[in-house]
């Protein structure tokens, strides 16, 4: 079970202040899978991440997960939890990754995901941080906007691979 694996590994590094998980850590990273794995905010995966942050006393940048909203739209959403398990940030990926690699892989997040339209910045005792997701990082304006809101560093949960990374 993925959540058991995540907890086992958070336990190994529980003396850390921050733990970060990868993009779509809780489901196979294929656009066709996102609807089946999508949960409403505060669903099972969200609850588990909140509990792990509290149990191990860490800030948890909980990678990303497919989030379904009340209109049925699905977003690639990142949540950040503080040491008490409280959600302190939520960010929905705004730059969806659509690619057709010549002679190779084809992947279109926009087939199933909806783009977000906000930025996320959060405060900790270590400073102010921003969060964006994977392909978003290639758009410097997003980082600039986070910096203008006080972000001193940016978390970037990502799932680049050897094919999509250079693309």
Where are the regions that the model predicts?
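Short hydrophobic/aromatic-enriched beta-strand-loop microsegments
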Residues: 38-39, 153-157
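Contiguous N-terminal and early-domain "leader" segments and peripheral loops that mark the onset or edge
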Residues: 1-3, 154
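Cys-nucleophile CN-hydrolase/nitrilase-fold catalytic domain and related Cys-dependent amidase chemistry
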Residues: 3-84, 90, 99, 161-167
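Structural motif
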Residues: 17-18, 129, 153
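Active-site catalytic loop in hydrolytic enzyme cores
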Residues: 69-149, 157-167
